[in-house]
A protein has these predicted regions:
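Aromatic/hydrophobic beta-strand junction motif of beta-rich domains
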Residues: 206-221
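Beta-strand-rich recognition/accessory modules
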Residues: 39-43, 55, 81-83, 115-204, ...
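Catalytic cores of extracellular degradative/oxidative enzymes
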Residues: 287-447
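Low-complexity, Pro/Ser/Thr- and charge-rich linker/hinge segments at domain boundaries
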Residues: 89-92, 188-209, 270-312
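Extended, loop-rich substrate-binding clefts of extracytoplasmic carbohydrate-active enzymes
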Residues: 2-62, 66-70, 147-161, 167, ...
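Extended acidic/polar, glycine-enriched regions
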Residues: 218-286
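Acidic (Asp/Glu-rich), glycine- and aromatic
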Residues: 39-108, 266-270, 274-280
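Short, hydrophobic/aromatic beta-strand segments
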Residues: 69-79, 185-188, 222-227
């Protein structure tokens, strides 16, 4: 793939054409040290020009769709690849780049940072009127996406657009690339390129009781903010500061996704996509309850009895070391690492603040049946008393399947993964706090 690898679908007099520039031999119209212009002849008397121009430390990428026919042309889909900073294993890691992007209509932008975190940052912004409205996982970015988005099965939120080009008219779009020295300069450049700098507090995932404050800054005037659900989204304009900063207060009463469309400049738009959840206390309690009710194995015939495992939402079933489902890695249901450790430590933290007898009993069941003397060695097991098997499967480690204690730490001696120790120390400490602070579990402290 190369920069300028563009594809599009357009309609002329009821007939649809889908073309990829990679399949058509172009004509080079200009090739100088600071500029190259390339031309493609497309079906139905349509021409497409791409021009790359170097201006100091900046590069402009201009796309010109020229309708030379006698009939209107409707561009329904236009997409491009962006092979910039893709992971390249043929070079050293520090020479690669990390890509970050905000896909947000006319205010979309991309930037690439060195993997080392040091050095210049490459920023890509939109030319006036250019908008990115959709992207696919395989790296296709859409300027128009009328056919690309499956509105029946896809949950994509941004609207799809098309562009009608009249006879002998040009449709111009494009991008700018520039270098910045740091993240603050990224924001400054976005502002300079007529983008929108957004700051939101406390964040874009909120609960109904939160008041959300939003600051928008742009060289172009903010015309209006339009709520997706006007009766359930309160938008209050607080003030305009220093001419180019606009301050708003939002309040949401509808759970789920809530979109606010920002109209700015001359018919430009971008979006503020919020997600509104139930109150935090409700969420904390619901999550702990689900873990205990749905995600713990209770089968004394299994070596993983007591394990908190992963729940397959699509199939509504609990996965296990005997049944990985669509998982690729055994460690995800083996009892260690983040997928397993996160659940008991969460339930224990929750019960320090909001104690529940059934949930505390679930933690005790986990410790007695899965951890003590199994995942974790007891104080009487030698060598390595109290050692924790931070592995895909402690049962196989203990059995000697992968070796003994002198095998370098891959068999019976695999107890070197430090992260698991901090997790289980936290669980023990939380159980102590529960027993000490909550009268309903005074019997636990005595144990």
């Amino acid at each position: 793939k190369y920069l300028g690898d563009l594809s599009l679908t357009y309609e002329v007099r009821g007939k649809s054409y889908t073309v990829s520039l990679a399949d058509i031999t172009p004509q080079v119209l200009s090739n100088t040290p600071d500029k190259i212009q390339i031309f493609w002849q497309l079906p139905s008397d349509v021409r497409l020009y791409q021009t790359f121009t170097i201006k100091g430390e900046e590069v402009d990428w201009e796309i010109d769709f020229f309708n030379r026919s006698h009939h209107p042309v409707k561009v329904t889909d236009m997409w491009f690849a962006l092979p910039v900073g893709a992971l390249d294993e043929s070079i050293q890691a520090h020479q690669n780049l990390n890509r970050h992007f905000s896909l947000n209509g006319n205010a979309s932008f991309f930037y690439w940072t060195p993997l080392t975190g040091q050095g210049d940052i490459l920023l890509m912004t939109m030319h006036k009127g250019t908008a990115i409205e959709y992207a696919t996982q395989d790296g296709k970015y859409y300027l128009h996406s009328m056919n690309a988005v499956d509105r029946t099965n896809d949950s994509w939120r941004l609207p799809s657009t098309s562009k009608t080009v009249q006879p002998y008219e040009h449709y111009m779009t494009g991008f700018n690339f520039t270098l910045t020295g740091n993240h603050e300069e990224v924001k400054t450049k976005i502002y300079d390129k007529h983008g929108v700098v957004v700051k939101v507090a406390p964040g874009m995932v909120v609960t109904p009781e939160f008041e959300v404050y939003c600051a928008l800054q742009s060289k172009l005037p903010i015309v209006e903010l339009v709520a997706e659900y006007p009766e359930e989204i309160q938008i209050t304009s607080l003030r305009q500061k220093e001419g180019d900063k606009y301050i708003y207060k939002f309040r949401f009463s509808r759970l789920g996704e809530n979109l606010i469309t920002v109209h700015y400049g001359d018919d430009l738009i971008c979006f503020l996509d919020f997600f509104v959840t139930e109150p935090l206390e409700t969420l904390i309690k619901k999550r702990a309850r689900f873990i205990v009710d749905k995600q713990q194995h209770r089968d004394s015939s299994k070596w993983y009895n007591g394990l908190y495992s992963l729940w397959d939402m699509e199939k509504s079933e609990l996965l296990s070391p005997d049944h990985l489902g669509d998982l690729r890695e055994e460690f995800m249901v083996g009892g260690s690492d983040d997928p397993s450790n996160s659940k008991p430590v969460y339930v224990s933290e929750k019960n320090v603040i909001y104690p529940n007898k059934e949930e505390i009993a679930s933690l005790e069941y986990y410790e007695e049946n899965f951890v003590w003397g199994k995942l974790q060695r007891t104080d009487e097991e030698y060598p390595y008393p109290y050692g924790i098997y931070g592995s895909e499967n402690w049962y196989q480690n203990r059995s000697g399947k992968y070796g003994g204690y002198e095998d370098g730490g891959s068999g019976k001696g695999r107890m070197w993964r430090t992260f698991d120790y901090t997790t289980h120390f936290a669980i023990y400490y939380n159980l102590y706090r529960i027993a000490e602070d909550k009268p309903i579990r005074a019997d636990l402290l005595r144990r």
